[in-house]
Each structure stands twice: as C-alpha cells, then as structure tokens.
Amino acid sequence: MGQKVNPCIFRTGPNLPRNWESVLYANKNNYSDFLLKILKIRKIINTEYSFAQITKILIEWPSSKNIVVNIYAKKIGVIIGKSGGDIEKLKQNIAKITSADVSINICEVKKPELEEAFIAQTIAQQLERRQSFKKVMKKAIHASMKQGAKGIKIICSGRLGGVEIARSESYKEGRVPLQTIRADIRYAFAEAITTYGVIGVKVWVYRCDVNQSRINEVK
C-alpha cells in the first residue's frame, strides 16, 4: 500500500527547498511549552486577521526574552490598522502568551497567485458565497499558471453544489512531481463552511526545481 506524506514536511530541512517556519531554542523539558505557545500565536493571528489573506507566518524565538514574528499577507492594511493600532494590540496579546519583547514585521506578498495558502483560502471563500466550484477551481489554476507556476493541482471534497452524496473533484495543469525532493512544491489546506456542510480544499503548487547551488537561498 502506498503511504502519503505532507509535501511540505517532506521537503523541509537544511539542504532541502524549504526551511522551518518556526525557529526556537529549547530543551526536552520546556519544548512542549514553547510549541504550545507558538500554536496559540498562530491561531490568534489566523483568527483575528482571516480577511488579510495571510500566506505565511514565520516565528523566530532566539531566547526567552525576545521573539520575532514575520507575517506575509496580501492585504497588509488589515493587519496594521489605523495608525498601527492593530499591530500594538497584537504585540500585547503575544506578549501575554510569551512574556517576551515582541517584534512584528509585516511583508506584502507580490504574487499571491503563486501562494498555496492564498489560493486555498480564496477558493474556500468563494465556495462559501455559493459560487460554482468548477469555475472557481479553473480560474485559480489559470491565474497561477499565468504568474509562472510550472504546475498546480486542486482537490475539493464534500457536498459540492449541495448534492446529497459527497464526492471529490480535482483539476490539474502542468506537472506536480511529488516524488522529486528537489521540486519546490507548496501545499495548503482550507475549509469552506457552507450551509450544506464543510468542503475541504487542497492545493499543490509546483514552482520550480531547486538546484544544489541555490537550495539554501529558497525559503
């Protein structure tokens, strides 16, 4: 039987296309505490700023006294707020969890059509508005390929179109070589909460092949 593995974890490491999205220094006694706090931080950011279309959150925790949070999003104005008021509120919430000095960097995503999280979130939001899943999926694939993706695959599962029997529909364009480790493939998952149930959205985006000389330059 074939075994499935998360394509992001499969390609994460010092000599692989992806780096870790959370970097911290901990021992076996306090590692679980650090991990729980990081999960709380990610949940707060994704919940309070769900309309900012966040694509990635990088957390650097070099010591117990300092923590740096880098947020990549399409709509950075939603996170910053008026006169930076929302940023200060977010800093206070994170400081309560970590008891450390918090630094937050907001980065705007220039090509969101290539970001797997943005694609999955956009499809989920459109499905919640009862748009046709076929049109939504094809539109997302076309936009991603137009921006330079080498391949993309999208799967939607659930009661598509409100039918009684749940099923899965998939669309693919280009190549998505999941067995090639040097292939920079990004994966994301999102859920659409509809009146007739939850629809799961899975997205794979194949950006490029990473050569050994460039492998450390790719995030």
Curated annotation (Swiss-Prot):
Alphabetical list of Gene3D superfamilies matching this protein: 3.30.300.20, Ribosomal protein S3, C-terminal domain (3.30.1140.32)
Recorded name of the encoding gene: rpsC
Organism, scientific name: Orientia tsutsugamushi (strain Ikeda) (Rickettsia tsutsugamushi)
Similarity field: Belongs to the universal ribosomal protein uS3 family.
Record InterPro entries: KH_dom-like_a/b, KH_dom_type_2, KH_sf_prok-type, Ribosomal_S3_C_sf, Ribosomal_uS3_bac-typ, Ribosomal_uS3_C
Assembly and oligomerization: Part of the 30S ribosomal subunit. Forms a tight complex with proteins S10 and S14.
Function: Binds the lower part of the 30S subunit head. Binds mRNA in the 70S ribosome, positioning it for translation.
A GO molecular-function descriptor: rRNA binding
Alphabetized Pfam families for the sequence: KH_2, Ribosomal_S3_C
Record-annotated KH type-2 domain positions: 41-110
Keywords, ordered alphabetically: Ribonucleoprotein, Ribosomal protein, RNA-binding, rRNA-binding
Protein name as annotated: Small ribosomal subunit protein uS3
SUPFAM superfamilies, sorted: Prokaryotic type KH domain (KH-domain type II), Ribosomal protein S3 C-terminal domain
Span of the signal peptide: none
NCBIfam families: rpsC_bact
